């Protein structure tokens, strides 16, 4: 399939604690994207510092790492046509107040510090994040029987 790509999506501790995992996964499945990998884990501080390295000079960096380490996260890799761009649209804006109803953040969030989900912002970021969170053998290649009903 042309333009098929992968993205990294992580349900943050607030999304896990609020029981939104199933709803979020359901939205990606119903859109037609294919789950390639998933881990339910407590991310180490070192992993989180590397993941958010671009934000290391921001005043909220330490609090972000502490918060993300405070509970389990669901780390996932999704695959599909333009999944990075479409996934970001499905998530909504980083600040939930700017997110439209129908998006994950628009439907389930109020404050930016508790915006329940992370999604790669580019194909390059997705590749980096996937390599950081998953070993190559953890990515499962398979053909979904639904693909013929989703893509021409």
Swiss-Prot record:
What Gene Ontology molecular-function terms does this entry list?
3'-5' exonuclease activity; ATP binding; DNA nuclease activity; GTP binding; identical protein binding; magnesium ion binding; nucleoside diphosphate kinase activity; ribosomal small subunit binding
Q: What is this protein called in UniProt?
A: Nucleoside diphosphate kinase A 2
NCBIfam families in alphabetical order: PRK00668.1 (NF001908)
Query: What is the scientific name of the source organism?
Result: Bos taurus
**Quick check: keyword Transferase in the entry?**
yes
**The EC number(s) this enzyme carries:** 2.7.4.6
Q: How does it assemble?
A: Homohexamer.
User: Cellular component GO terms, alphabetically?
Assistant: cytosol; early endosome; nucleus; ruffle membrane
Q: What does this protein do?
A: Major role in the synthesis of nucleoside triphosphates other than ATP. Possesses nucleoside-diphosphate kinase, serine/threonine-specific protein kinase, geranyl and farnesyl pyrophosphate kinase, histidine protein kinase and 3'-5' exonuclease activities. Involved in cell proliferation, differentiation and development, signal transduction, G protein-coupled receptor endocytosis, and gene expression. Required for neural development including neural patterning and cell fate determination.
Superkingdom to which the source organism belongs: Eukaryota
Entries under Pfam families matching the protein = NDK
Q: What's noted about post-translational modification? A: The N-terminus is blocked.
Q: Which cofactor does it need?
A: Mg(2+)
Q: Which InterPro entries match?
A: NDK-like_dom, NDK-like_dom_sf, Nucleoside_diP_kinase, Nucleoside_diP_kinase_AS
**Binding residue positions for ATP:** 12, 60, 88, 94, 105, 115
* Coiled-coil residue windows: none
Which biological process annotations from GO are given for this protein?
A: cell differentiation; CTP biosynthetic process; endocytosis; GTP biosynthetic process; lactation; nervous system development; positive regulation of epithelial cell proliferation; UTP biosynthetic process
**PROSITE patterns cross-referenced by the UniProt entry:** NDPK (PS00469), NDPK_LIKE (PS51374)
């Amino acid at each position: 399939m042309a333009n098929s790509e992968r993205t990294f999506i992580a349900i943050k501790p607030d999304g896990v604690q609020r029981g939104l995992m199933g709803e979020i996964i359901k939205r990606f499945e119903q859109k037609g994207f294919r789950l390639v990998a998933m881990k339910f884990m407590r991310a180490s501080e070192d992993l989180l510092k590397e993941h958010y390295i671009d934000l290391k000079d921001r005043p909220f960096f330490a609090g972000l790492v502490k918060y993300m380490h405070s509970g389990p996260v669901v780390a996932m890799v999704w695959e599909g046509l333009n999944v990075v761009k479409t996934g970001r649209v499905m998530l909504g804006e980083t600040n939930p107040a700017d997110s439209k109803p129908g998006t994950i953040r628009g439907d389930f969030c109020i404050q930016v510090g508790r915006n329940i989900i992370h999604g790669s912002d580019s194909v390059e970021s997705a590749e980096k994040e996937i390599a950081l969170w998953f070993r190559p053998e953890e990515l499962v290649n398979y053909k979904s029987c639904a693909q013929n009903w989703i893509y021409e």
